[in-house]
A protein has these predicted regions:
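Glycine-centered loop/turn motifs
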Residues: 135-139, 143
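Amphipathic alpha-helical interface elements
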Residues: 1-132, 145-171
Length: 171
C-alpha cells in the first residue's frame, strides 16, 4: 500500500499515484497459478486463478479509492461491499453502477466466494451468468469464465481509475 498517509499527500501526488496505478496488472498472480497448473490441472488452476484475480482486484481497488477519496480505515473496510461502495462513491460524485464493468466486479466476487465457501457450486446469484452454469450444480469451464472475467475486470479497474483521476482534474 502507499507509504504515506493520504492526508499528507498533495493533490498532484495523489494524481500521480493514481495515474501510475493505471499500469497495474491485476492478473499477475492468477496467470502464475495457471502456468504452474499444467494441462492435467487446467480447470483447478483456473478455479484458483479466479480467486487470486478477485483478491488482486479488491486490494488494488480499495487502495485506489482510499487514496483518491481520503477514506478512513472504517470506510476503507466498507468499500469492499457493494452497497457501501455505491454509497461512498455516490457521496463523492461517482455513480459506481455507471462505471463500465461494475457488475463484473460483483460477479467476480460472487464466483470467488462460491469457490471458497460453497465448494464451487453455482449459487442463485450466479445462475446463468455463463450459459454453462446452473444453480445447484458444480461450476464448470473455469478457463472460459476466467478469460471473460479477467478481461472485463481489467476494463472496470481502468474505468474506475479514470473516474477517480477526473476528481483531481486529470484525464
Amino acid at each position: 500500500m502507499i507509504e504515506q498517509s493520504p492526508e499528507s499527500l498533495s493533490d498532484i501526488e495523489i494524481l500521480d499515484i493514481l495515474q501510475s496505478m493505471k499500469k497495474d496488472e491485476l492478473d499477475v498472480e492468477a496467470n502464475e497459478i495457471i502456468r504452474n497448473g499444467g494441462k492435467a490441472g487446467r480447470q483447478e488452476a483456473h478455479k484458483q486463478a479466479l480467486v487470486a484475480l478477485n483478491t488482486s482486484f479488491e486490494e488494488k481497488f480499495v487502495e485506489a479509492v482510499t487514496l483518491a477519496l481520503g477514506l478512513n480505515a472504517g470506510q476503507a473496510k466498507k468499500i469492499r461491499y457493494k452497497k457501501d461502495r455505491i454509497r461512498i462513491l455516490k457521496v463523492r460524485g461517482i455513480d459506481y453502477l455507471a462505471i463500465d464493468g461494475a457488475e463484473t466486479a460483483q460477479v467476480l466476487s460472487q464466483v470467488a466466494q462460491a469457490i471458497s465457501r460453497e465448494d464451487a457450486i453455482v449459487t442463485e446469484g450466479l445462475h446463468n451468468i455463463f450459459p454453462f452454469w446452473k444453480e445447484g450444480w458444480p461450476m464448470v469451464q473455469f478457463d472460459n469464465a476466467y478469460k471473460i472475467l479477467s478481461e472485463d475486470i481489467a476494463i472496470h479497474y481502468q474505468a474506475t481509475l479514470d473516474d477517480l483521476i477526473s476528481l483531481y482534474g486529470g484525464n
